[in-house]
Amino acid sequence: MNTNKLSLRRNVIYLAVVQGSNYLLPLLTFPYLVRTLGPENFGIFGFCQATMLYMIMFVEYGFNLTATQSIAKAADSKDKVTSIFWAVIFSKIVLIVITLIFLTSMTLLVPEYNKHAVIIWSFVPALVGNLIYPIWLFQGKEKMKWLTLSSILSRLAIIPLTFIFVNTKSDIAIAGFIQSSANLVAGIIALAIVVHEGWIGKVTLSLHNVRRSLADGFHVFISTSAISLYSTGIVIILGFISGPTSVGNFNAANTIRNALQGLLNPITQAIYPRISSTLVLNRVKGVILIKKSLTCLSLIGGAFSLILLLGASILVKISIGPGYDNAVIVLMIISPLPFLISLSNVYGIQVMLTHNYKKEFSKILIAAGLLSLLLIFPLTTLFKEIGAAITLLATECLVTSLMLMFVRNNKLLVC
């Protein structure tokens, strides 16, 4: 077996461990948090967490895709890697300053956020962690072993802290701070590894590189914003319209779905930089790799969707417990998402983005975001968390369909 295949498989395994720590380790505390906080306070927790995820999305700006691709193409040149690294870091510093100003204004001026200001600010460590955690550097250089180490250590650290310090329904802010601190700890460990390995040179500030970095990531940022509109945004709108209990039911079911779906991420994250670099050298080999990825992801995603559909009642009963009756219905409605998202990841990220169709990719996700806005208000008003689940499913169906049509119409998978 050649070195490239061994390297790819090794990276998939490392990323599987990373995703296991990201999704499965928090599941050790998930049932405890759900039961300790109760449906209403767990809903408040989810509402504030979703708000902070929007802030993180702004700071992330799509660099996990664009910077990964840039690093993958320049992995053998320390000077180029250094230039890309500092351009992204300084870009993120600009974005985090804007974010903190906006967050301060929001918690002062919006009554719903003012009421939960302490809880919202308890999630800020995750924002800082996103700034200093260069996942894109590790992925671009295909050095997943170190990414695995930093992720596992940080996730393990928060487990005992949750059981020790979160004891009553009122400990929402403590729970938020502990959960969000995992990203910060992971970022500190990752930066120490980067320095120790000598992957980057001295600090270089180039305004031209910062502007170019922001420009390169703009269309992906618009795309991720649109995705957040119909994923994270649904939780926020549901909270405003239907209240924290509905958010608690939706968030509980969606957490189970994300835990299973997240197991697909090792394959998608490991193969993306490999596809990017392979297409540059040999398009035919790149297309063959994409088709293999499509087969693998669709089969696994389909199996996960069946597990969620057929096992919804058991999964909710075991992981959540009593008081979350509507979570079973929500989980059944959103059960097709792992299959749909596995397809849209291939057609959108692995095909459209690697072929430089960033604008078209953005337009599809913007259309999906607009559809979610049209559906979310009437459906959540009428059906609360069930309406939110229907909105999410309908939006993902549109995304997958449009991406599939674009790829086929432009014959992007024809060698």
UniProtKB/Swiss-Prot annotation:
Localization: Cell inner membrane
Q: Where are the transmembrane segments?
A: 12-32, 42-62, 84-104, 118-138, 174-194, 221-241, 296-316, 329-349, 363-383, 386-406
- Keyword Lipid metabolism attributed: no
Q: Which residues lie on this side of the membrane: Periplasmic?
A: 33-41, 105-117, 195-220, 317-328, 384-385
Pathway listed: Bacterial outer membrane biogenesis; LPS O-antigen biosynthesis
Q: Name one GO biological process term.
A: response to antibiotic
* Keywords, comma-separated and alphabetical: Cell inner membrane, Cell membrane, Lipopolysaccharide biosynthesis, Membrane, Transmembrane, Transmembrane helix, Transport
Pfam families listed in its UniProt record: Polysacc_synt
Topology within the bilayer:
Multi-pass membrane protein
Cytoplasmic topological segments: 1-11, 63-83, 139-173, 242-295, 350-362, 407-415
Superkingdom of source: Bacteria
Q: Name one GO cellular component term.
A: plasma membrane
Q: What is this protein for, i.e. what is its function?
A: May be involved in the translocation process of the nascent O-polysaccharide molecules and/or its ligation to lipid A core units.
What PANTHER family does the database record attribute to this sequence? O-ANTIGEN TRANSPORTER-RELATED, PST FAMILY PREDICTED COLANIC ACID TRANSPORTER
Q: Into which family does the record put it?
A: Belongs to the polysaccharide synthase family.
Annotated protein name in UniProt: Putative O-antigen transporter
Q: What species is given as this protein's source?
A: Escherichia coli (strain K12)
Which gene is this protein's source? rfbX
